A protein has these predicted regions:
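A short acidic, Gly/Pro-enriched loop at the edge of an enzyme's catalytic core
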Residues: 96-105
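A short glycine-rich, Lys/Arg-flanked "PGG" loop and its adjoining helix->strand segment in the class I
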Residues: 119-134
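Helix-to-beta-strand junctions that scaffold the AdoMet/dcAdoMet cofactor pocket
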Residues: 58, 114-115, 129-131
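Conserved Class I S-adenosyl-L-methionine
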Residues: 192-255
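Conserved alpha-helix/loop element of class I SAM-dependent methyltransferases that forms part
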Residues: 18-37, 52
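Class I SAM-dependent methyltransferase SAM/SAH-binding core
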Residues: 40, 46-95, 120
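Class I SAM-dependent methyltransferase Rossmann-like catalytic core
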Residues: 2-22
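Conserved catalytic/acceptor-binding region of the Class I
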Residues: 136-205
């Protein structure tokens, strides 16, 4: 049974740090969230997004956060428990019918970790959307692959590493472009699409971006045991060059 790519003792904290309240609210309102709704947050992680969605369905709404990690469900319960919020540990690849039906099912930054089976996962999740309800899929496209000012050796290494992630860790850096087709093939009506930048990094590096990207590089490099062949000093030399680029206020990065 494959392990979640970003699994680490600090993953719940990383998810908390990187989750921007304003962005989640804007996306949820665009998707059609309203007071009184029953909402499922699939792949809820730390529970921060679940709490944001809960605020948007008040008065009278409830949100169920679902995640496959018992550790993150405990973290979510410790940090975001409230009346009208329930957290459940469950494998989202297995049947979800016992959760009941929902007015809105929210799936954000989850499918990128399931390159080979994301279509099946969406079909499974779709079973808990009530007739006339909303299934909102949000994910990144060309993930961690858009840079200006990247030294050639660093660029080759990053692109090669992303290919290895697809081969060894079921990771999909192009998940975003596939979302429309999933909904279309399942027969959804009134499908709408919105495309915007998620990572948008220029000028002074924010502490939250520095922590998030450092943690991603650290965890992913260890998980897939990637060999930094162009760097005689291996991972440490690669990391030093990446951080010189990433902390330079003249660089530009977006996803």
């Amino acid at each position: 049974d494959e392990e979640y790519l970003m699994e680490s003792n600090e993953e719940a904290f990383r998810l908390d740090v990187k989750t921007d309240i304003e962005s989640v609210e804007k996306q949820a309102l665009w998707a059609g969230i309203k007071p009184g709704m029953r909402v499922a947050d699939i792949g809820c992680g730390s529970g921060k997004t679940t709490a944001i969605l809960h605020n948007l369905v008040q008065p009278g709404g409830v949100v169920v956060g679902v995640d496959g990690s018992e550790k993150r469900i405990i973290y979510a319960q410790d940090h975001y428990a409230a009346q009208g919020i329930k957290f459940i540990c469950k494998d989202i690849r297995e049947p979800l019918g016992d959760l009941g039906l929902f007015d809105l099912v929210w799936v954000r930054f989850l499918l990128e970790y399931y390159l080979s089976n994301s279509s099946d996962i969406v079909e499974n999740i779709s079973e808990i959307v009530k007739p006339g309800g909303i299934l909102c899929l949000i994910d990144l496209d060309h993930n961690c692959l858009n840079y200006c000012g990247l030294p050639p050796k660093l660029e080759r290494t990053i692109f090669a590493a992303m290919r290895v992630l697809g081969e060894k860790a079921n990771f999909d850096p192009y998940a975003g472009r596939r979302l429309y087709s999933y909904l279309y093939k399942l027969g959804y009506q009134d499908i709408d699409v919105n495309v915007s930048a998620h990572h948008l990094i220029f000028g002074r590096l924010r502490d939250s971006d520095a922590f998030n990207w450092m943690k991603k590089i650290e965890v992913v490099s260890r998980k897939v045991n990637y060999q930094f062949e162009e760097y005689k000093g291996g991972y440490e030399e690669f990391l030093n060059e990446f951080m010189r680029f990433f902390t330079d206020p003249g660089r530009f990065v977006y996803t």
